[in-house]
C-alpha cells in the first residue's frame, strides 16, 4: 500500500498483509496517515476499507500512491464541516473509519471511479469538481457529488 496525505505532506509505502495476517505495525502506520488531519485524532480504520484500497490498487494496475484527501474524520470535525455546509454526510462513513477520499497522479478520477464501481465493495462517490473519488466499505451504492475542495 502506498499513501500520500495531501494535507500533511506525509507519505507511506508499506505491506499491511502477509502470510494470511494483517501486519500490526503497518496497520498502525496506515491509521496515522489516514488520521483526522484537523485534530490529529486517530481511529483504527476498518479492515474492509484497507482491503478495498488494496484491491483498487490492483485493479488499477498501479504502484503510484493514492493521494488521500480524507480518511478518518472525527465526529467533531464532521459536525463542524456539516454545519458549515461543506457537503459532508451527517453520519459519514469517515467517522467510522470506513471511508477514504482519494485521487492518484497516475490514474484519472474517472478510471478510479470505474475501477471502484467494478469491485462492488461498497460506496463510490465521484466528485469531478473537487477532483477525488470517495470509496467506503459500506453498502454497495454510487453517487455523483458536487463538493469543491
Predicted feature residues:
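Active-site acidic/histidine clusters and adjacent loop/turn architecture
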Residues: 18-69
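Acidic helix-start/capping segments at beta-turn-to-alpha-helix junctions
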Residues: 65-79
Amino acid at each position: 500500500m502506498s499513501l500520500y496525505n495531501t494535507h500533511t505532506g506525509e507519505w507511506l509505502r508499506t505491506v499491511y498483509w502477509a502470510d494470511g495476517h494483517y501486519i500490526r505495525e503497518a496497520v498502525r502506520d496506515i491509521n496515522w496517515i489516514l488520521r483526522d488531519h484537523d485534530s490529529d485524532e486517530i481511529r483504527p480504520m476498518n479492515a474492509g476499507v484497507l482491503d478495498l484500497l488494496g484491491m483498487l490498487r490492483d485493479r488499477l494496475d498501479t504502484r503510484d500512491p493514492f493521494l488521500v484527501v480524507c480518511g478518518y474524520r472525527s465526529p467533531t470535525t464532521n459536525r463542524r464541516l456539516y454545519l458549515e455546509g461543506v457537503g459532508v454526510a451527517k453520519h459519514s462513513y469517515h467517522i467510522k473509519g470506513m471511508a477514504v477520499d482519494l485521487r492518484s497522479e497516475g490514474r484519472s478520477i474517472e478510471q478510479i471511479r470505474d475501477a471502484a464501481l467494478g469491485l462492488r465493495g461498497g460506496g463510490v462517490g465521484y466528485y469531478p469538481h473537487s477532483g477525488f473519488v470517495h470509496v467506503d466499505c459500506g453498502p454497495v451504492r454510487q453517487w455523483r457529488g458536487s463538493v469543491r475542495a
